Amino acid sequence: MARVQARKGKTQSRKAATQTRKARVQGNDMIFALDIGTRSIIGMVGIVEENRVHITAIEREDHAERAMIDGQIENIEKVSALADKVKKRLEAKVKTKLTRVCVAAAGRALRTRRADYELELPGTQLIDDEIISRLEAGAIGKAEEAFDAENEAQNDNRRFYLVGYTVCQYYLDQYTMSNLKDHRGQHVKVDLIATFLPSEVVESLYTTMNKIGLEVASITLEPIAAINAAIPENLRLLNLALVDIGAGTSDIAACTGGSITGYTMATVAGDEITEAIMKQYLVDFGTAETIKAQIRQEDPIIFTNILGFEQKVPQEELLQSIKETSGLLCREIADKILEINGGAPSALFLAGGGSKLTGLKEELTVTLGMDDTRVAVAGNYFHANAYSSEYELNNPEYTT
């Protein structure tokens, strides 16, 4: 009997080895993205088809413990283990070994600098990629100089990385342009926003990916990723704002006149609501998260506190217990929107798990002094960039 089991084990091992050899390696047309959030990790795999991504697999796993705070990785070991679990489940679904990943960075110390740069061209020169690269590099250089000078003046010795930039506007012979390539002119200019994050935020993200055998193919910022997913370019002529309310951070971006005009981040987000429930009802973090998720139901919520006593709380009482914290969250988000937009936008999109919180949309509408028909949950425009026959993508949690 033992010999039969041994032979069977060897046969299974050979089959597993054969399956491993047969697994494809991720091709250039396959995109693997990980959203490493404060409460969960969501992974997506898609194939680029005619300028859109066909999403073929999605996996999600929640953190069992608080391994991330305010969008920043605190426990690399735990986050990498969870990310590896998501990656392996996706690999099994798409029968492909995933080697490259796209990620979006968040953090408690996002800082931006706006800069412009211009070039005089000989004659009416054809503008190619090399000229556009020189133009953008010049503006980035000016942004870095201004950023370094400010840090020096404030005796801030922390190391920062330039992690991305967004072009606000191009100019050709004093006229605004959305794209300079293949035009001819004598004078070109670019206006852009450069973004910086502390080195520990970026390095922890790279270390986490390296631990599970992934190369970071691209890194962007969560506010940029959110607005690119939720608001297509043809809508950016309007003055719109997007808030992606996660567990640890609320990522904010604004656009008008066809381009992104600013983005920022607030460290007040869904976890503050969870912590308010913990303190009010003496429950652990996991129980508080479950209670928060059930606020939308009208029936009383039943749970057991840390002392072992069962409690039954009506929805109205629960909403009252988080009212102060919810108001603080809305005021913080509203202040950040007004700061980067110069006023209330014409319309506001809400994304992320926090956008589902009962009453938050209505309270934010009042705080900004907007009409309730001008505030909506994002998701209707995801089809501009991605589609799926297997999954329902119009979920605000899939924004980044």
What residue spans do the PLM features occupy?
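Short beta-alpha connecting loops at secondary-structure transitions
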Residues: 261-262, 275, 317, 386-396
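Glycine-rich phosphate-binding loop of actin/hexokinase-like ATP-binding domains
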Residues: 192, 238-276
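Catalytic P-loop NTP-binding/switch module of NTPases
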Residues: 273, 278-285
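Nucleotide/phosphate-binding catalytic cleft detector across ATP-hydrolyzing
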Residues: 1-40, 44-240, 261, 270, ...
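A general structural motif
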Residues: 325-334
